[in-house]
Amino acid sequence: MAITLTWIGHATWLVDTGHGVLLVDPFFEESPTACMKGADVACDAILVTHGHADHVGDLVPIARRTGAPVY
C-alpha cells in the first residue's frame, strides 16, 4: 500500500493512506503558498502540530464542514 504525501503550502500537508486522508496543520486562506482553498479540502482526520495561527488558521471551518476529528 502506497502513502501519498501532498504539500499544500507552508506547513500544510495531505496524507493519503489509501484508507483515509489526514490533513496536517490546516492553514489555507492566509497562506501565500497554499495551492488550494480550504473549502476544497476533503479529509477524514485533522492533525494540528501546535497552536500557532499559521498551523490552525482554517481548522474550525474545515473540521465543521467535514466532521473530521481533530488530533
Q: Regions from the language model: what does each represent?
A:
Residues 1-6:
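Extreme N-terminal starter segment of soluble prokaryotic enzymes
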Residues 12-52, 57-64:
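Pre-active-site segment of Zn-dependent metallo-hydrolases
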Residues 44, 68-71:
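Short internal beta-strands
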